[in-house]
């Protein structure tokens, strides 16, 4: 057996990989093991499995998403622990890039073999490897760097299911809630609803008792042993939680015992706003536990006092460290308790009311989960900040990270490519030069001043570091060209830049006269449209800098007319004037993005507008008017006739909104897009290709129309893509918002949905070499092409993705659920061929 296969078996015995992991499949290759270990997460867990607490998993990045910076940090953490804890010599270790770039995977296997023979590893009783003679064929490792370059990791697997118990504190919570069960009367089996109500009441009572015990048995005795700063750091806002839950417990008890639970739904709705103080608690609980650990190690008197307090509180069963995690568990249970109650409520009015309470508690749970997730992001950002030299600005101001990695850059007036490492955020790109394990900042690019454009001509060179795209300055200053190592990496970078730019300039940011911009809200805030909370700790949503309206990204298009159309009116929020090269920009330099209206009837000035309004604006049917001022209740609006340039007032019923013209999309970087092409040329392209090879072409005789050409049963078939009302479709029963969505959907679903005789999916893009498509299919295996569907859900709300891992939803979307493992309230699923993560509280699962 080859060494890499023996290594995989050893990792399974160490409980790092599950027994059915893809490295055990008959089709498995050394590539699969390399890809699995490449981000360093499993290696860190391996050391913890061999000796507990070798590495603090809170200090590594459990979801590095193949960020080069975060993966290398994980790998270096593993290598350091191999020396310091396992006594290995540096000469026995691989280098970080040997694994990340798989430039010497043989050395990685050798290091793991030596690790398996260390005294600590042998003490576990697990046999080291290799256990048998094997031919060490170095040739199998030679092609790995190229293979890694060709294959981007999709976020498709529950890779860390067996690794890390994110549900920290869950067992403690369950133990505490069950402690009183023996003393409670049993619920009748035929009345599950009564059981649900009893559980809500009893667990609230027990939880309040737990909070009170923290206050009585830990806070009061420890006050004289800790400094004020230490005390606040450990106990955060527990006194506020105690007061809150005493009141909540009383109201729940009163509703269930005295009012036949008729107002229970209202209790939870009323308390949603008050329960958001859990955001503060959940933000601080991790550092509270770290502070407690540090104080216990450095102050012997505190350590002894903690043990004494624990014995008095619960006979030593639970430590303060255990109990600090319980509040985070409780606040995430309310929606689950209400969900059960709704399920077993039959009265239509009661059910509808309880659903309102359920929505409120789901919103609260998602808010808390996003606070937790943002705390992970802030830890990443802090690591970036500490590793980049000469960086004097707080990285936090640049928004959330979208990706990082190596790239080559030229300015558009020079042609020398410079090797750089870039960190891409929502609002900026930090361009760095790598210096050992750290980075030297060379430039910060403000993305608010740029737009992105593909350079399709570079794709024809077909060699490494030749795949380019442009970053173009919107005010005509010198731009940049970025070069990527492979075509796939270029596609990924383009998507990440486009996502960042869509966060800066989202659709509908200026609709209804608004001026919405990404914003960090210092107080808990709700969306003006859906009334749900803006979630997280920074850049939670969008603020109109004219009227102060607040909204989610997905809700921007549904905000009512701006209350301050004229930016000079009282109460308007103003942005500081932007300057370019020290000169104030004139209005002509900026596209104000004002709404455009189409004139539907002539207007020559009769009837005239009111005298105090101003002069009439003459219009001809078909003219386009730029709307300057007006609201839904005004008889006359002010605008500029783009044909004459004149400004004046006109009847509001003389115009209608201009039809939305979608921006032209550049598909040239897609491996399936052929550009303008006729049927005969398409048939020539496909004639010598395998069946299910396809292309999408622009039909030259029909402007704006597309067609799919696919080889099926050794013949080229052609399918016209119909466009109507802004949607694309080949079958009337399934429509898509973009050509990209349509192609993605039919990659996974047979074309027979629209054409009975055409039973195939879109499998092989015609630009992709046949061998690479085949290899990728073989490596992926059937299970990745067809993930196991755990259930079906319906989207209850719109959701707009903030990065490439997330899945945008529209209300009513049917979602296939693939994963529910995330403890942060996110599930993984598919909508119309698009796969990604979405908030579980935004969907309702079919029973």
From Swiss-Prot:
Organs and tissues of expression: Isoform 1 and isoform 3 are widely expressed; both are expressed at very low levels in skeletal muscle. In keratinocytes, isoform 1 is less abundant than isoform 3. Isoform 3 is detected at very low levels, if any, in adrenal gland, bone marrow, spleen, fetal brain and spinal cord; in these tissues, isoform 1 is readily detectable.
Region described as Sufficient for interaction with ROS1: spans on this chain: 560-847
Superkingdom, taxonomy of origin: Eukaryota
UniProt domain DH: residue ranges: 192-371
Record GO biological process: angiogenesis; B cell receptor signaling pathway; cell migration; DNA damage response; Fc-epsilon receptor signaling pathway; Fc-gamma receptor signaling pathway involved in phagocytosis; immune response-regulating cell surface receptor signaling pathway; integrin-mediated signaling pathway
Stored InterPro entries: CAMSAP-like_CH_dom, CH_dom, CH_dom_sf, DBL_dom_sf, DH_dom, GDS_CDC24_CS, PE/DAG-bd, PH-like_dom_sf
Swiss-Prot/TrEMBL induction comment: Down-regulated by EGF and TGF-beta.
Keywords assigned by UniProt, alphabetized: Angiogenesis, Guanine-nucleotide releasing factor, Metal-binding, Phosphoprotein, Repeat, SH2 domain, SH3 domain, Zinc, Zinc-finger
SMART domains named in the record: C1 (SM00109), CH (SM00033), PH (SM00233), RhoGEF (SM00325), SH2 (SM00252), SH3 (SM00326)
GO molecular function terms noted in the UniProt entry: epidermal growth factor receptor binding; GTPase activator activity; guanyl-nucleotide exchange factor activity; zinc ion binding
Record note on quaternary structure: Interacts with the PH domain of SH2B2. Interacts (via SH2 domains) with the phosphorylated form of EPHA2. Interacts with ROS1; constitutive interaction that mediates VAV3 phosphorylation.
PANTHER family on file: GUANINE NUCLEOTIDE EXCHANGE FACTOR VAV3 (PTHR45818:SF1), PROTEIN VAV (PTHR45818)
Protein name: Guanine nucleotide exchange factor VAV3
Name of encoding gene: VAV3
């Amino acid at each position: 057996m080859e060494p890499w296969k023996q290594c995989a078996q050893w990792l399974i015995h160490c409980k790092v990989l599950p027994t059915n992991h893809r490295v055990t499949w008959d089709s498995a290759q050394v590539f699969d093991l390399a890809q699995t270990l490449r981000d360093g997460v499993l290696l860190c867990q391996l050391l913890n499995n061999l000796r507990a607490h070798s590495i603090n998993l809170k200090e590594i990045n459990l979801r590095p998403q193949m960020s080069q910076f975060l993966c290398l940090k994980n790998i270096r953490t593993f290598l350091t622990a191999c020396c310091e804890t396992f006594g290995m010599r540096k000469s026995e270790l691989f280098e970080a890039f040997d694994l990340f770039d798989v430039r010497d995977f043989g050395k990685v296997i050798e290091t793991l073999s030596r690790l398996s023979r260390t005294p600590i590893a042998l003490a576990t009783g697990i046999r080291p490897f290799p256990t048998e003679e094997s031919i060490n064929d170095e040739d199998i490792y030679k092609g790995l760097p190229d293979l890694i370059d060709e294959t981007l990791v999709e976020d498709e697997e529950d890779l860390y299911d067996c690794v890390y118990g994110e549900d920290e504190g869950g067992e403690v919570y369950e133990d505490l809630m069950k402690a009183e069960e023996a003393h409670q009367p049993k619920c009748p089996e035929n009345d599950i609803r009564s059981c649900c109500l009893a559980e809500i009441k009893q667990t609230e009572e027990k939880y309040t008792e737990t909070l009170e015990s923290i206050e009585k048995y830990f806070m009061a005795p420890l006050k004289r042993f800790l400094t004020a700063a230490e005390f606040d750091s450990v106990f955060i806002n527990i006194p506020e939680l105690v007061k809150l839950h005493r009141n909540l417990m009383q109201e729940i008890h009163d509703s269930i015992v005295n009012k036949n639970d008729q107002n229970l739904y209202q209790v939870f709705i009323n308390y949603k706003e008050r329960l958001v103080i859990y955001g503060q608690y959940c933000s601080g609980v991790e550092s509270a536990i770290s502070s407690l650990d540090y104080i216990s190690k450095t102050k012997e008197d505190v350590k002894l006092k903690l043990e004494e307090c624990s014995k008095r509180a619960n006979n030593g069963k639970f430590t303060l460290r255990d109990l600090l995690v319980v509040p985070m568990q409780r606040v995430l249970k309310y929606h689950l308790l209400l969900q059960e109650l709704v399920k077993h409520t039959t009265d239509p009015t009661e059910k509808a009311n309880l659903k309102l309470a359920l929505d409120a508690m789901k919103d609260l749970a998602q808010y808390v989960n996003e606070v937790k997730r943002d705390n992970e992001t802030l830890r990443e950002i802090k690591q970036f900040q500490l590793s980049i030299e000469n960086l004097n600005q707080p990285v936090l101001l640049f928004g959330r990270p979208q990706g990082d990695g190596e790239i080559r850059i030229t300015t558009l007036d020079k042609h020398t490519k410079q090797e750089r490492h870039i960190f891409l955020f929502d609002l900026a790109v930090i361009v760095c030069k790598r210096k050992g394990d750290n980075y030297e900042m060379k430039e910060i690019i403000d993305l608010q001043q740029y737009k992105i454009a593909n350079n399709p001509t570079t794709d024809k060179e077909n060699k490494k570091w030749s795949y380019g795209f442009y970053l173009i300055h919107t005010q005509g200053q010198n731009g940049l060209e970025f070069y990527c190592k492979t075509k796939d990496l270029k596609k990924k970078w383009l998507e990440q830049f486009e996502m960042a730019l869509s966060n800066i300039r989202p659709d509908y940011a200026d609709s209804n006269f608004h001026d919405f911009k990404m914003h960090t809200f210092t107080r808990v805030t709700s969306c003006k449209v859906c009334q749900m909370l803006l979630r997280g700790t920074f850049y939670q949503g969008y603020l109109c800098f004219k009227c102060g309206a607040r909204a989610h990204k997905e809700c921007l298009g549904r905000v009512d007319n701006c209350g301050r159309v004229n930016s000079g009116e009282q109460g308007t929020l103003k942005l500081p004037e932007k300057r370019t090269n020290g000169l104030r920009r004139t209005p002509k330099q900026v596209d104000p993005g004002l709404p455009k209206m189409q004139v539907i009837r002539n207007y020559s000035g009769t009837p005239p507008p009111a005298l105090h309004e101003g002069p009439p604006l003459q219009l001809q049917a078909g003219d386009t008017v730029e709307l300057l001022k007006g609201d839904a209740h005004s008889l006359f609006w002010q605008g500029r006739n783009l044909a004459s340039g004149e400004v004046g007032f006109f009847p509001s019923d003389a115009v209608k909104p201009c039809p939305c013209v979608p921006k032209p999309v550049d598909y040239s970087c897609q491996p399936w897009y052929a550009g303008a092409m006729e049927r005969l040329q398409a048939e020539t392209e496909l004639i010598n290709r395998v069946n299910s090879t396809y292309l999408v072409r622009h039909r030259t005789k029909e402007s704006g129309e597309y067609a799919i050409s696919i080889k099926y049963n050794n013949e080229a078939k052609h399918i016209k893509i119909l466009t109507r009302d802004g949607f694309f479709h080949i079958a009337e029963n399934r429509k898509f918002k973009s050509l990209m969505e349509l192609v993605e959907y039919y990659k996974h679903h047979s074309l027979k949905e629209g054409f009975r005789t055409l039973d195939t999916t879109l499998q092989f893009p015609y630009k992709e070499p046949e061998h690479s498509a085949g290899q990728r299919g073989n490596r992926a295996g059937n299970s990745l092409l067809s993930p196991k569907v755990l259930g079906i859900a319906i989207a209850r709300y719109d959701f707009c993705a903030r990065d490439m891992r997330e899945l945008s939803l529209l209300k009513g979307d049917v979602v296939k659920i693939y994963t529910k493992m995330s403890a942060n309230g996110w599930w993984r699923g598919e909508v119309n061929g698009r796969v990604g993560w979405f908030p579980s509280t935004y969907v309702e699962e079919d029973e």
